[in-house]
Amino acid sequence: MLYFCLLLVLLLPNNGVSSEASCARMDVPVMQRIAQGLCTSSCTAQKCMTGICKKVDSHPTCFCGGCSNANDVSLDTLISQLPHN
């Protein structure tokens, strides 16, 4: 149930959730798969094929792959490109 609630929060459009939030617990063994799943789901919601948690300057960051630009791009970058209401 917790996973489902977190997933709903991350899939809401333009909710201000950073890529660090979806991958924040990637170093905790039990939470590793959940963090990866949240990253992938967030990227899929941004019309990318997949997502992966990586460390950038010791900060966990969600990178989306298989997007229209064919490059890996951080989730934060994709969210910042969304039209603002």
From Swiss-Prot:
Tissue expression from the record: Expressed in the pharynx and body wall muscle.
Record has Transmembrane helix as a keyword: no
UniProtKB keywords: Secreted, Signal
Gene3D superfamilies recorded: Antibacterial factor-related peptide
TM stretches of this protein: none
Cross-referenced InterPro entries: Abf-1/2, Abf-1/2_sf
Main subcellular location: secreted
Protein's UniProt keywords contain Secreted: yes
One BP annotation, GO: defense response to other organism
Signal peptide (residue range): 1-19
CC per GO annotation: extracellular region
Localization annotation: Secreted
Pfam families: Antimicrobial25
PANTHER family membership: ANTIBACTERIAL FACTOR-RELATED PEPTIDE 1-RELATED
Protein name: Antibacterial factor-related peptide 1
Gene behind this protein: abf-1
